């Protein structure tokens, strides 16, 4: 029997609040996804705090919007960001996301920009030591999350971003870290599109917690440098997005698809137009 992608997409499609500009009322983001018939949302901390956690919880409950992800905890190489996990776990207990994203943080400390607190040892990037040090912090977060019935989603980060974004980089290595606990992986196509395990993991693994997707922007040397919306005049989809989306849509479980793009990627493009067109553009790819 032919798969009814349109019907499945109605329930599985999510969109992340990262695309929403700070100068537009966050309420209009929720209003926009409701108008577009999108039933799920990914949230980042700045958006949650701008909206107000209690007001946001009420709005999501009233409109029966499911939270697919809260972003992010971790950042093991930057103590300021690492210490935010207690606050974020408290948000998660109220908003009940499918997963809370873990980003491991860059070798030189935390998220962009690179931390000024980090010191190189003899000007050497000691990747092995950094991963070993981070492992104990990761296991601590796993334990704390389990105590509060929160599922974490560890996100493999593309190796080209090891300096400033994340130092757990492959699906296989991240899978080893969650195989004996309740936690899962978030697969972001921007970071994992080159991974040798991507296809089989998306199709079959019970450890998939969420697929985040967008089109990818490459520079003149075909290095990934950002994200693009799916369809626009002269906008080529360089990845076979259809294949990856279908892999998740054909699964019999409740794994969702979260469109993730940043405000810095879309610049002056009206986010409301992106949201209203998203479902149609995905179906055109399928």
Q: What is the role of each PLM region?
A:
Residues 15, 43, 70, 102, ...:
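Conserved beta-strand positions
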